[in-house]
């Protein structure tokens, strides 16, 4: 295809070089570009299973960053793609691209171009983006749609986070953390909630909240906002949006909404809910294979979004019943010695509280079972800002282990560590600075029936299997 533009891609995306191609979001875009007939090269700091998979699909991938990486594609790239957070502007490939006059564009801008000829459903919010997006995808697939999608975690059923579908719908997660959601102009926008976060980027809560108003202002003229009005921030957004003349569909626990959660109960590691939909005069039963009331609310948002795309409500409910979760969203890691271990991406106080609430609902199925929370704070700035709130959320568990801060892109802040949070926890708590000691310490206090959740956006996800191994060793 050298020198020839693939019919299903805009000219600037015919040949793309991706700096940091191994990242979850970047690799997903690479898969879609390849499946739509594009040529893709890329580089990353280290090899991974994801890169092996991309090579198998035809991508040219190099480990390490060097200006010569821009020569891997015949004719050279028509664009170089990168991300805001992970790649510095001094990266030698970006420097070389600018020297050659090759456009450097950000991943969200590429994703937005890939949606140009499709009906777009975009999900954003402080929490619940990935789960809600994934529910929409699974529901539409069950209804016979074959949507394209890009999501922040691997779907259990699909085993991937991105797909080029044959259908006319594109479903994606819109990241609010750095304002990149403003690249999109959705047909249907879903906002799960709005709560202070990412203040290291926005500076103030007001600036953070404003980006959601800017996002919904980009909804297409015949489009709609689907919004959870159980959340005060999202409810306020719904009112402001309706005042602009944009169609708003509300969901939550209150009567008279477009979709209402009337009742919810835990059923093993799943749930059953009674719901009502405004367009109908009878309640319905919604079954889920994932625990947690927050997941039931996410499912209501997915239901409204999917039906806006033309899906049948009965088929949507059937599809949601089979949704088995997303990697790292209250994912069951395994069981050993009667102890179940879950893993969750929770890295904000509200997410931590929701994960522990779901954990307690699971524990209540077994008399005498305890909830054990293992939390790794993510970012020093977030730890400092929300230390009190994190401590309050963690205090809802029966026993708590707090690890040291996962720094990610930040430098340490004086006086800020995992102990900053642990000191405020009212439940039995242990602060462990030594990551290698955590699994054994947790295994030493659990017994048959107990449920454990590891939480955080860092490498705490590695601990689940280690805890299970320690429990087996002590049996």
Swiss-Prot record:
<dbReference type="Pfam" id="PF01225">
    <property type="entry name" value="Mur_ligase"/>
</dbReference>
<dbReference type="GO" id="GO:0009252">
    <property type="term" value="P:peptidoglycan biosynthetic process"/>
</dbReference>
<dbReference type="Pfam" id="PF08245">
    <property type="entry name" value="Mur_ligase_M"/>
</dbReference>
<keyword id="KW-0573">Peptidoglycan synthesis</keyword>
<dbReference type="GO" id="GO:0051301">
    <property type="term" value="P:cell division"/>
</dbReference>
<dbReference type="InterPro" id="IPR050061">
    <property type="entry name" value="MurCDEF_pg_biosynth"/>
</dbReference>
<dbReference type="InterPro" id="IPR036565">
    <property type="entry name" value="Mur-like_cat_sf"/>
</dbReference>
<dbReference type="InterPro" id="IPR005758">
    <property type="entry name" value="UDP-N-AcMur_Ala_ligase_MurC"/>
</dbReference>
<keyword id="KW-0436">Ligase</keyword>
<dbReference type="InterPro" id="IPR004101">
    <property type="entry name" value="Mur_ligase_C"/>
</dbReference>
<comment type="pathway">
    <text>Cell wall biogenesis; peptidoglycan biosynthesis.</text>
</comment>
<feature type="binding site">
    <location>
        <begin position="125"/>
        <end position="131"/>
    </location>
    <ligand>
        <name>ATP</name>
    </ligand>
</feature>
<keyword id="KW-0963">Cytoplasm</keyword>
<keyword id="KW-0133">Cell shape</keyword>
<comment type="function">
    <text>Cell wall formation.</text>
</comment>
<dbReference type="InterPro" id="IPR036615">
    <property type="entry name" value="Mur_ligase_C_dom_sf"/>
</dbReference>
<dbReference type="Pfam" id="PF02875">
    <property type="entry name" value="Mur_ligase_C"/>
</dbReference>
<keyword id="KW-0961">Cell wall biogenesis/degradation</keyword>
<dbReference type="GO" id="GO:0008360">
    <property type="term" value="P:regulation of cell shape"/>
</dbReference>
<keyword id="KW-0547">Nucleotide-binding</keyword>
<dbReference type="GO" id="GO:0071555">
    <property type="term" value="P:cell wall organization"/>
</dbReference>
<keyword id="KW-0132">Cell division</keyword>
<dbReference type="GO" id="GO:0008763">
    <property type="term" value="F:UDP-N-acetylmuramate-L-alanine ligase activity"/>
</dbReference>
<dbReference type="GO" id="GO:0005737">
    <property type="term" value="C:cytoplasm"/>
</dbReference>
<keyword id="KW-0131">Cell cycle</keyword>
<keyword id="KW-0067">ATP-binding</keyword>
<protein>
    <recommendedName>
        <fullName>UDP-N-acetylmuramate--L-alanine ligase</fullName>
        <ecNumber>6.3.2.8</ecNumber>
    </recommendedName>
</protein>
<dbReference type="InterPro" id="IPR000713">
    <property type="entry name" value="Mur_ligase_N"/>
</dbReference>
<comment type="similarity">
    <text>Belongs to the MurCDEF family.</text>
</comment>
<dbReference type="InterPro" id="IPR013221">
    <property type="entry name" value="Mur_ligase_cen"/>
</dbReference>
<dbReference type="GO" id="GO:0005524">
    <property type="term" value="F:ATP binding"/>
</dbReference>
């Amino acid at each position: 295809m050298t020198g020839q533009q693939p019919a299903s891609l805009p000219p600037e995306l015919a040949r793309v070089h991706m700096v940091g191609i191994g990242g979850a979001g970047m690799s997903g875009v690479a898969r879609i570009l390849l499946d739509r007939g594009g040529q893709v090269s890329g580089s990353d700091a280290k090899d991974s299973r994801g890169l092996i998979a991309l090579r198998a699909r035809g991508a040219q991938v190099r480990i390490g960053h060097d200006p010569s990486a821009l020569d891997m594609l015949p004719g050279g790239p028509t664009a170089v793609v990168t991300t805001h957070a992970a790649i510095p502007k001094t990266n030698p490939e970006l420097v070389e691209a600018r020297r050659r006059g090759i456009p450097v564009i950000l991943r969200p801008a590429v994703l937005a171009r890939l949606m140009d000829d499709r009906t777009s459903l975009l999900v954003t919010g402080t929490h619940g983006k990935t789960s809600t997006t994934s529910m929409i995808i699974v529901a539409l697939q069950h209804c016979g749609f074959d949507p394209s999608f890009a999501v922040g975690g691997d779907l259990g059923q699909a085993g991937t986070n991105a797909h080029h579908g044959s259908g006319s719908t594109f479903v994606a997660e819109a990241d609010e953390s750095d304002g990149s959601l403003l690249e999109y102009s959705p047909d249907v926008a879903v906002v799960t909630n709005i709560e202070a976060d990412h203040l290291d980027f926005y500076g103030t809560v007001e600036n953070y909240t404003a980006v959601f108003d800017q996002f919904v202002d980009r909804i297409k003229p015949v489009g709609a906002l689907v919004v959870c009005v159980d959340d005060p921030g999202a409810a306020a957004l719904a009112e402001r949006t309706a005042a602009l003349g944009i169609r708003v569909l509300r969901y939550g626990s209150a009567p008279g909404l477009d979709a209402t959660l009337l009742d919810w109960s835990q059923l093993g590691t799943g749930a059953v809910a009674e719901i009502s939909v405004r367009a109908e005069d009878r309640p319905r039963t919604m079954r889920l294979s994932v625990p947690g009331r927050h997941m039931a609310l996410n499912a209501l948002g997915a239901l409204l979004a999917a039906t806006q795309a033309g899906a049948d409500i009965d088929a949507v409910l059937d599809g949601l019943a089979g949704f088995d979760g997303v990697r790292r969203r209250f994912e069951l890691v395994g069981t050993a010695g009667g102890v179940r271990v879950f893993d969750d991406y929770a890295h904000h106080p509200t997410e931590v509280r929701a994960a522990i609430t779901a954990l307690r609902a699971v524990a209540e199925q077994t008399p005498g079972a305890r909830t054990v929370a293992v939390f790794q704070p993510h970012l020093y700035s977030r730890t400092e800002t929300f230390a009190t709130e994190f401590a309050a959320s963690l205090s809802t568990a029966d026993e708590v282990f707090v690890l040291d801060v996962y720094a990610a892109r930040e430098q340490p802040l004086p006086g800020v560590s995992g102990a900053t949070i642990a000191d405020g926890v009212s439940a039995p708590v242990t602060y462990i600075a030594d990551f290698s000691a955590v699994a054994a310490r947790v295994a030493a206090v659990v017994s048959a029936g107990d449920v454990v959740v590891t939480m955080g956006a860092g490498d705490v996800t590695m601990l689940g299997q280690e805890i299970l191994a320690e429990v087996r060793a002590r049996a």
